[in-house]
Amino acid sequence: GGQLPLFQVAGSKGKQPFKIEIKEVPDTDRDGAINLDDVKYLLKHDKNTATPLKGSGDFRSDECIELLKQADIVVTNPPFSLFREYLAQLMEYKKKFLILGDQNNITKKDIFKFIRENRVWLGYDNGGTKWFQVPDDYDITTESRKKIENGVKYFSMGRILWFTNLETT
């Protein structure tokens, strides 16, 4: 597997990590929701930028911590093996966030503590399967967890939830 390119980032070299700064979020196709087509549009216009990072992209690096300090809201899919450490960092810097994680995280003492204190909760879920686009060579052995639509391969990761501290209605 590997990182799937959403778009080309000027100045990037191969699989180099990049940052995205979004300062304006219009619904460009006017369908009532922000989707990948809207994001592609956003990133190709002056008020929104995607630029390569200087370092490795490790969330613990000085460069990434400086970016975190500037962020109003963090939306990401952190490394699942480092989820606890990543969430602790978001809490330390008092950031608003919407992040993906394995449902088993709610059983971890250091994460459940935030849930019990109402500082973190589970985000909205569509009650169905979440499909993630994967590279063509990504091996999926269970047929029910794989689908191909319009030539694009997707994988279902059944235990994935949204974790957030954003107010919802």
What label would you give each PLM region?
Residues 1-75, 79-169:
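Class I S-adenosyl-L-methionine-dependent methyltransferase catalytic core
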